[in-house]
Amino acid sequence: MNIVILAAGTGKRMRSALPKVLHPLAGRPLLSHVIDTARALAPSRLVVVIGHGAEQVRAAVAAPDVQFAVQEQQLGTGHAVRQALPLLDPSQPTLVLYGDVPLTRTATLKRLADAATDARYGVLTVTLDDPTGYGRIVRDQAGCVTRIVEQKDASPDELRIDEINTGIVVAPTAQLSMWLGALGNDNAQGEYYLTDVVEQAIEAGFEIVTTQPDDGWETLGVNSKAQLAELERIHQRNLADALLAAGVTLADPARIDVRGTLACGRDVSIDVNCVFEGDVTLADGVTIGANCVIRHAAIAAGARVDAFSHLDGATVGANAVVGPYARLRPGAVLAADAHVGNFVEVKNATLGQGSKANHLTYLGDADIGARVNVGAGTITCNYDGANKFRTVIEDDVFVGSDTQFVAPVRVGRGVTVAAGTTVWKDVAADMLVLNDKTQTAKSGYVRPVKKKS
C-alpha cells in the first residue's frame, strides 16, 4: 500500500511562523505522529506532500523511508495528491492521510484499507452532533454514497446531514491518477477537491465503502491553537488511561503530561503536575512527587523523587532519594541509596552508593565515592573560564559545610574536610584538611543605627 500524507497547508489560523504540521503535540510535531501511524501499516511507499515551509518540514521529519513531493501552490487536496503520484506504486492502493490529524488509530486505518480491497473506493466517515464546517456524505435511498459535498457548496438539505467526510480515503492508484487528472475547480473555493473523485469513481462503476472510527476524536484536525490544546488534552488523557490500565497510580489522571515515552514498572506512583519528556524509565516501586519535570532519565527500583525536582539526562539508582527542589543535569549518576536534597544541583557527576548531599550544593564534573557526606554549601569549582576540570572524592569522606573544591583535585579515602575549607591541592587518605584561620572578638563595638527620617 502507498500512503500519502498531505502537509502543505499554510495554517493561517495558527497565527504562527512555524508551519502548522510542526506544532508540537505531546512534545513532537503533529506530522511525526501521523508518520508513525503510517509506518505501523508497513507501506511500500510513504510520501509527504509539503508546501508552506517546505524545507523546514523536510528537515524536521526526514528519514530513509520518507519521500517528499512539493505542492508549490496550495490549490486543494486533489491537487496535493496529484503531486505525489509520480512517487507511488500504481499497482498498490493509496491511503491518503493528513499531517494535522494526528490521533487516528492504526486499527481504524487498517479496517478502512481492508474494506477497500478489490478495487473499492474507501472513505473514513464520522457522525457528529455538530457537523458545521465539514463536507457531508450524501447517500441515496438505498444508503449508497453518491457524492461528498463541501460545506460551502452544500444545499440547505445537505447541511442537515450529520455524517461527515474526514478526508481520509483509500483508492486504487492507477484509477486515482486518472480521476485526479480530470478534476475541475468549479466550486466556491476555486480548488481541486479530492472529494470530487467520489463521483468519478461511482461513474466508473466503483463501489464506495465507508467505515467509521471507534472514537470521534480520532479524526479531529488542528486549525487553531485552541484545537491544538483540545487535542493535547485528549491525547494526554489517553496516555494517562494507558498508564492506569498498566497499574500505575496517578494522583490525578488529568494532571500528567507525557511528551515522549514513559515506561513504568509495577507499583509506580506519580503525583500531580508532573511532566515526562523524551525516554523515561521508572522501575518497580518508584515514587514521583508533585510538580516534577523528568527528561531522558532512568530511575531504578524503589527510588523516590520528591516534589519540584528537575531531572534531565540523569540516572538514579535503587532506593535513592532526590529532592525536594533538586536538579540533576545531564550526566548525573546517583548510585543505590544515594541522597540529593533540596537546592542541590548535580551535573556530569557520580554520587556513590549511600552518599548524601542534602542541602544547598553544586556538584559538577565530579566523581564521588561511596558513603560520602557532603555538607551544606559545598561547591566543586570546575570551570576556569575556558576549561572544565574534575573533582575526585573517594569513599568515606566527610565534607563539612561551606567547602570549595578547586578542580582538578583529588581527596583520598576517609578524609575529613573541616567546615569552611577551600581544597585546592590533593589530600591523602585519612587526613584532616582545613584552612588555618584566626577568629577575633572585639569588645566595645557599636553597631551602626539607621537614621530615622
Swiss-Prot record:
Q: Looking at the record, which segments are called Pyrophosphorylase?
A: 1-225
Q: Give a Pfam family name.
A: NTP_transf_3
Query: What domain of life?
Result: Bacteria
Which residues are recorded as binding acetyl-CoA? 376, 382-383, 401, 419
The entry marks the following residues as binding Mg(2+), namely 100, 223
Q: Which Enzyme Commission number(s) are on file for it? A: 2.7.7.23, 2.3.1.157
Give GO MF terms, alphabetically: glucosamine-1-phosphate N-acetyltransferase activity; magnesium ion binding; UDP-N-acetylglucosamine diphosphorylase activity
Q: Which GO terms describe its cellular component?
A: cytoplasm; membrane
- Gene3D superfamilies the record matches: Hexapeptide repeat proteins, Spore Coat Polysaccharide Biosynthesis Protein SpsA, Chain A
Q: What is this protein called?
A: Bifunctional protein GlmU
Gene that codes for this? glmU
Its UniProt entry gives the catalysed reaction(s) as:
alpha-D-glucosamine 1-phosphate + acetyl-CoA = N-acetyl-alpha-D-glucosamine 1-phosphate + CoA + H(+); N-acetyl-alpha-D-glucosamine 1-phosphate + UTP + H(+) = UDP-N-acetyl-alpha-D-glucosamine + diphosphate
List every stretch annotated N-acetyltransferase.
Answer: 247-453
Organism equals Burkholderia pseudomallei (strain K96243)
**Looking at the keywords, is Electron transport present?**
no
**PANTHER family noted in UniProt:** BIFUNCTIONAL PROTEIN GLMU, NUCLEOTIDYL TRANSFERASE
Signal peptide (from-to): none
Q: Where in the cell is it found?
A: Cytoplasm
Region Linker, as annotated, extends over: 226-246
Q: How is the cofactor bound?
A: Binds 1 Mg(2+) ion per subunit.
**Record's subunit section:** Homotrimer.
Please state what class of enzyme this protein is: transferase
Q: Which UniProt keywords apply?
A: Acyltransferase, Cell shape, Cell wall biogenesis/degradation, Cytoplasm, Magnesium, Metal-binding, Multifunctional enzyme, Nucleotidyltransferase, Peptidoglycan synthesis, Repeat, Transferase
